[in-house]
Amino acid sequence: MTFCILFLFWTITHLARRILTRQGAELTKANIVAVLGTGAVGALAYTFTDTFWFSAVEGEVYALSSMFTALVVWLMLKWEEQADQPHSMRWIVLIAYLMGLSIGVHILNLLTIPALVFIYYFRKTQRITFKGIAVSTLISGAILIFINSIIIPHTVYIGALFDLFFVNSLGLPVNSGLVFFVVALLGALGVGVYFTHKKGRTVLNLVLLSTLMILIGYSSYASVTIRAAANPPMNSNNPSNPFALYSLLNRDQYGDKPLLYGPQFSAPTSGYKYKDVRYLDDDGKYKTVSIISGYEHPDEFMHLFPRMWNYAASKESYKSWSAYRTRTDYERDENGEIVRDAQGRPNKIEVLDFGRRTLWDDGSGYEPLVIVEPTFRENLNYFFTYQLNHMYWRYFLWNFVGRQSDIQPTDAIITDGNWLSGIKWIDELYLGPQDNLPDEIANNKGRNTYYFLPFLLGLIGLIYQLNRDPRNFSIVMWLFVMMGIALVVYFNTSPNEPRERDYVYAGSFYAFCIWIGLGVLAVCDLIVWATRRKGLMAPIAATVVCMVVPGILAAQNWDDHDRSHRTMARDIGWNYLQSVLPNAIIINYGDNDTFPLWFNQEVDGVRPDVRIMNTSYLGAEWYIDELKTKANDAPGIPFTLPRSKYTYTNDMLPIENIVDRPLELKEAIDFIRNEDPRTKLVLSNGSKIDYLPSNRFALPVNKDNAIASGIVKESDRDLMVDTIYLELPKRTIDKSEMMLLDMLAHFDWKRPIHFTQVYILQSLGLLNYLQFDGYSYRLVPIYTPNRSVHEIGRIDPDYITPLLTETFRYGNIADPRTYADYFIQYNLSASKARESFARAAKEYVFRGDSIQAIRLLDMGLEKLPPQQIRYTDANTFPFIEGYYMAGAPDKGDSLLMSYARNLMQYIDYYLDFQGIQGDMVTQTIIDKMQSLDRLYYLAAYMGRQDVLAQLNDYYRTLGIYENELIHPDLSTPSDSVQIPE
């Protein structure tokens, strides 16, 4: 990242010199100081922006990608500076090589190409014309398409076709055809470069040489294939042959999304799209299979600019972000008659006025379907409201105006994650009152306010460059738009992204920081005009004044970007691995659950006996193959289905309940494996597919193996059931679920199986056969009905207590210098980190060991203190209840009132909201009141009169509970007052 800032500094100083030396003027000492000031202010401003700083300390590709962006822009400016020299084209050749090299980092760097083309055009042209601009735009688009759509995918694809011939027809080894093609292609380009140079064909020589350099840089991907061929334990997509590499580069796993023309989320399907794919079979030959690659849609449901396209996204979120309207209508019964009240008056209701309704006959012979499609206006509303405003301009203002908090908002709410200036009257216009803030909001380290200063200086610099140097202004604007708004159009984002995406637009913020730097020149000119004095004082004063911008960025962003003392990202993976038994299989989902485990195991060598299985990948044949093999010290997963049953087939497996009894799981898997035509389901088109003949299954329990493997203690033998009965609450299962059933059918209780997320078990009907081990759930043959979503599985305090007190690590969260940001708090919540202490403590209370229970509760609050981890019902209520149950009422009262004061602060604050803003926080007030009520009921049940008195005083100040019967002062616990679940 240091080099990124260095190249940005040089870029800004170059552009500043172009402004100051126009018409051949010489640089004076004052000008040199001004130039250096522009570079320092702009580069330092970008250094301390929220998005860039976050990317700089994140283990991701975007930091290196930013460096490539800054480097190629600076190199093109170096060419522009030396364009008249004999060997100036070497800069363009170097840029071509770096472009090819950067493809291996991220393709976002290609978006600098339009700016580079215009630098070339402006340098080579004295008179700018509309035709020249249009031609330059077309050329830049052609170069983009050539690299992104031809070089990146099709060089590999053509090599794959050669490999197909060499392997299947000539019997040569895999990748021999690819090697032949690469050598032939590079050789042909080399010959072309030689002869065009010899014949003086300068332009063609430059094109061929640049193409050759792009390919040489792009050849860094060879390391991916070489690594994959070595079969390492982690081998994503297994690109060990050119067809697999082509699929990886073509991003097949992400699917397609419409950009300018296509269907919307409600469009019906009229058929499937098919494509041929080739893969290596067990005999070492390529096989070809036709697979479904997407859906066909009727022509009448294809539209321009389909922004609301994702059928898997939340329809309600699409509607809320598209500024839908409501209208008043009459309530009608099932017969269509108007519903009337006792006086005969019609009932009026608010009806969603969204989309247009189209009748569509699907050819089935039934009544036409009513399809509700978003209108073009609603698509535009969604584009401007969500995709542009929420997913770009909000991020832009985060970086140059300020940020409300580090909490990711859900839908269009005003309480979290918005931009914030620090200027009270402006912020109150759209975020509500800014006085009387709750402590958690006021003290959120992600709450950063810059008072519009970076934005205003950048705007001044933008106008200044537009006025003084319109050519270079257009170049910076190309960078700003292509790496910002153009990406918004390209990504066509669906609502409710799993994480904030501001890092994608770092290149656009980089461009704006160029204008921040150039704003120093404008301020310098203003000082000269005001003082009527030229000399060193004006640029020095301008630089000092403008240094306020990077200064305020650094001061405000320092605390929430300081990752020192924090080790939670590593420790959470350690905890997951340490929570499982020896030789276990741990099954998880998604990035946050998996990458920390992989790091601990592959880098730090933690628990090599454990096999990690990510269900997000379990639908891919390469991952199933990988799981079958030994990794580190862990044996493969006991899958038994052959490759023919999961390689480009059985993505969805129907369930037909034709067997009126629970099938033993082995029988069910054998039924899938069977090739007898009688075990196939015949579709309407005559094709035959595998299916399951029942949704009820029996999993026999080998009690001796369960005890020998440590799954169950000998003392709990009598608690084990003989058979676990599963019932799948669905009509189909996907490939990952099919493979999980295969594993369960054949593991024979010889290896412990742990899960990090209970939803995986919910889909398999296993929620009542779990043991919570703190961070993971162990599959056990002991029936344990669930009491609530927060208390799933049984607890063995003898097993979990040493883990909680001696083994687990807590990321140094207890240190007040450690910043527990939104991601840390989310992961702690998902892993039930603090709740583990309370659940274990409750088991000790049941045993009669109150001392140990209190010790665990104290340790939970010590390791993960409320001052660092935000209060929630899930992570606080069990501790209060635990203290009361363990006979420590004073500690329970203290924690209860701390949480109550937190809730009261929020309620007091949100009750100040008025009008539409008040409507937007109504549900939040209700949620906080319900939490406060839970605390009241608990205090009443426990007979805590002092606490009740304080809570009743608060309720009276609100004036919302005038009737004392709602919240009575109970002198003794009453059976009529129950602790709500």
Label each residue range with its predicted role:
Residues 13-24, 36, 51-52, 57-66, ...:
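ER/secretory pathway lumenal C-terminal domains and tails of membrane proteins involved
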Residues 39-47, 99:
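Short helix- or helix-capping micro-motifs
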